[in-house]
Amino acid sequence: MDNFGTTNSFTFTHVFDNRDNYFNASKGRRISFAAQWGGHGLGGDYDFYKFTAEGRFYKALGNGHILALRLMGGYIDGDVSYGNLFDLGGSDTLRGYEDDQFKGKKMYAATLEYRFPIAKKVQGVLFTDAGSTWGIDEGKIPWYTDDDSLNWSVGVGIRLQTPIGPIRLDYGHGDRNKFNFSFGTQF
């Protein structure tokens, strides 16, 4: 698998979003579908189709308690660069694992979070993440072993709402115990 070359592509995305708040949703859903086509005909070095679907669902439980669920799936057909593979691991997908630890042409993932108030503008989070990537041809990435097994983690986190957006600190227990600090919402 070559990581050098030009990727030229078109992407079509459709999004339905009725969440009550972009940064800290307590009800509603966001559902998105994306289809990407890249090809030599566009002047690129890779011919591929990439399909991605994601659903985010939020349920207010009362008194500031929220249940949030994210489901994702994806499929790539054709030849893509290493950088265009699906990846899981790190603060946005599988907390408790290294960033982009898992790569593949096929992917599914899920996150379930229970969010609860601690103080004004401070929220606690209990979470579990699960997912898998696979579908890389044997030997395409010499140092990578394709593995379709389910990887999962559990953890706790804290959210601080600031004027410039949310700040997140999560501790995930996966194959490693790892802290993740980041800005913005995970989902």
Language-model features: locations:
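Short small-residue beta-strand/loop micro-motif enriched in glycine and branched aliphatics
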Residues: 135-137, 165-168
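A short pocket-lining beta-strand/turn micro-motif at the edge of beta-sheets
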Residues: 106-108, 120-124, 150-154, 162-167, ...
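C-terminal beta-signal and adjacent terminal beta-strands/loops
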Residues: 129-149, 175, 187
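Short, exposed beta-strand-loop hairpins at the edges of beta-sheets
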Residues: 170-173
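C-terminal outer-membrane beta-barrel translocator/porin domains of Gram-negative envelope proteins
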Residues: 1-118, 124-130, 134
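Outer-membrane beta-barrel "beta-signal"
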Residues: 11, 91, 156-162, 176-187
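Secondary-structure boundary/capping motif
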Residues: 65-68, 114, 153, 178-182
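Short glycine-rich, acidic/polar surface loops and turns
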Residues: 111-113, 143-145, 153-158
